[in-house]
Curated annotation (Swiss-Prot):
Species name: Methanosarcina acetivorans (strain ATCC 35395 / DSM 2834 / JCM 12185 / C2A)
Family matches, as Gene3D superfamilies: 3.40.1190.20
One GO term (biological process): thiamine diphosphate biosynthetic process
Catalytic activity from the UniProt record: 5-(2-hydroxyethyl)-4-methylthiazole + ATP = 4-methyl-5-(2-phosphooxyethyl)-thiazole + ADP + H(+)
Protein name (database record): Hydroxyethylthiazole kinase
Length: 261
């Protein structure tokens, strides 16, 4: 898609989040800064109905409860019925048995179009040896790009692995996105924001691999622009929102930094 940001801002897709309580505010604000409309409906009594009127569903397991999992399954089933893209951010997989079991339950029960996580989280989901410290990646034995490609084929989905370089694969195509800045890792929530951004780009582009690649290029470019004006995490966070708000397709076109493997 040549002008995804213009399309997002013209159509203002509604992005339904069932997400974690730590970064819910940040995800809502970032979705809005890009030009889409966020909604955070978690109750099992209404979540499926909200999904039905949305353009994408973003699930984030950062602060899990049994009720939240029930809501995620209800909403994902509703999204599957209507061919609405579903993004799963596998936050903290590998840290606890409950988290691992619930992530596996989601994947076994509904179709996820885009699975996102850091290197350790995706490796753990894919059955590889990996270490996770809380919700942070520590180490992975296998080649990340190969893990992403194989897992994408196995799940018939797009896999997004975030890190110093972001890896996106649909099992056939694999992209390495190099946009971004180290300050993005200094504030809580940028990984969760990335999942929201992937969701809103998927809402306007049915090629989910291309959508995820663009989402991370645009977000990473915003981080680079914000870092140039910042003296630390506090000022960076403010500038990040401003740079996203003032972003344009034309500006990102010259900044995109990715390669296809």
């Amino acid at each position: 898609m040549n002008e995804p940001l213009k399309t997002i801002r013209e159509t203002k897709p509604l992005i339904h989040h069932i997400t974690n309580w730590v970064t819910i505010y940040e995800c809502a604000n970032m979705t809005r800064a890009f030009g889409a409309l966020p909604v955070m409906a978690h109750a099992p009594e209404e979540c499926a109905d909200m999904t039905k009127i949305s353009s994408a569903l973003v699930l984030n397991i950062g602060t899990l409860t049994s009720e939240i999992i029930d809501s995620m399954l209800l909403s994902a089933a509703a999204a599957n019925e209507r061919d609405i893209p579903v993004v799963l951010d596998a936050v903290g997989v590998g840290a606890t048995k409950f988290r691992d079991e619930m992530a596996a339950k989601i994947l076994a029960s509904v179709h996820i179009d885009i699975i996102k996580g850091n290197y350790s989280e995706i490796a753990k989901l894919a059955g590889e040896n990996a270490e996770t410290k809380g919700v942070e990646a520590t180490s992975i034995d296998a080649d990340p790009a190969k893990v992403a490609k194989a897992f994408a084929k196995a799940e018939s989905c797009v896999v997004v692995m975030t890190g110093k370089e972001d890896i996106i694969s649909d099992g056939d195509r694999t992209f390495i996105v190099k946009n971004g800045h180290e300050l993005m890792g200094s504030i809580v929530g940028t990984g969760c924001m990335a999942a929201s951004i992937v969701g809103l780009f998927a809402a306007v582009n049915r090629d989910y691999c291309d959508a995820a690649k663009d989402a991370l290029c645009y977000f990473g470019a915003s981080g680079e622009l914000a870092a140039a004006k910042s003296s630390g995490p506090g000022s960076f966070k403010v500038h990040l929102y401003d740079e996203v708000f003032n972003l344009s397709d034309e500006k990102v076109k010259s900044m995109k930094n990715f390669e296809e493997k």
